[in-house]
């Protein structure tokens, strides 16, 4: 009887680096210390990459602050994914909006 070879699928990992210049900005690449596919201008603005973690993407359904499908697609197509910080909350605007709604409700 012929032996059946076991097919090994290539696991997908990403290496995540924290920016030394920009708070809450992260760069995801496929291999540790391989920034060969990252544009030079992006690297200048990013600063010295600081290793944050190595993360397996296979079997994972989501990431905390990034869409996992977008990350996988970007890694495959361009070799990196840049995670920018969320936009700042405008607490004053939110407060005034809520206060305006309360005023409108009492004037009816």
Swiss-Prot record:
It comes from Shigella sonnei (strain Ss046). Residues 12-96 form the YcgL domain. It holds the Pfam family YcgL. PANTHER family: PROTEIN YCGL. This is Protein YcgL. Gene3D superfamilies: YcgL domain. It comes from the Bacteria. InterPro entries: YcgL-like_sf (IPR038068), YcgL_dom (IPR027354).
